[in-house]
Curated annotation (Swiss-Prot):
Interacts with MbeA and MbeC to form the relaxosome. Keywords: Conjugation, Mobility protein, Plasmid. This is Mobilization protein MbeB. To E.coli MbaB and MbkB. The lineage of its organism: Bacteria, Pseudomonadati, Pseudomonadota, Gammaproteobacteria, Enterobacterales. It comes from the Bacteria. This protein is essential to promote the specific transfer of the plasmid in the presence of conjugative plasmids. The keyword Ribonucleoprotein does not apply. It comes from Escherichia coli. The gene is mbeB.
Length: 172
């Protein structure tokens, strides 16, 4: 029996060695598998992180371009609005200037005409005074087919034949 015990002890020893060897091998394999999985996860994590960073950078760049485009469009719109307002203002100023110029020209022309008319009236009054002085205030009036000589107040007339014509002599 001792042989059997010895064989059993050897078998148990071999089984124990084999179990330890299998355990070591499995531990090594699990460790390598863990390292491989960890490496793969780290690699994927890096790839995902890089992809996210690239997407974020691309999105930020696109967003910045969009912002600049919108900003430029707004500035262009602002310039267009200011240009339109400036053109409208200049057109209004031009119209006001033309109205003032036309009004001033009209007033200047009418002022000249009034001045000329006043000068003409003054000349006519002088001529009338000269005529009144020469005619001693006698006026000629025509009423239809009849003609009259009107004497000034305080004067009387006497008809005198002279040189083949009838003359009117004024008396006071």
């Amino acid at each position: 029996m001792s042989n059997l015990l010895q064989t059993g002890a050897e078998f148990e020893k071999k089984l124990k060695e084999r179990a330890e060897s299998t355990e070591k091998m499995l531990n090594n394999e699990f460790r390598r598998l863990g390292e491989s999985v960890s490496e793969a996860v780290t690699s994927n994590e890096t790839k995902i992180r890089d992809a996210i960073a690239l997407f974020t950078a691309s999105t930020e760049e696109s967003l910045e371009k969009h912002r600049e485009g919108v900003k430029e469009a707004m500035m262009q719109h602002r310039r267009d609005v200011l240009k339109l307002a400036g053109n409208t203002g200049m057109m209004l100023l031009g119209i006001v200037f033309l109205l003032f110029t036309a009004s001033g020209g009209t007033l200047w022309y009418l002022g000249g005409r009034i001045q000329a008319n006043l000068e003409e009236i003054r000349k006519q009054e002088e001529t009338l005074q000269k005529l009144n002085a020469k005619t001693w205030g006698v006026e000629f009036v025509q009423d239809g087919n009849r003609k009259f000589l009107v004497l000034p107040y305080g004067k009387s007339a006497e008809v005198i034949p002279f040189q083949g014509k009838e003359w009117v002599h004024l008396k006071e």
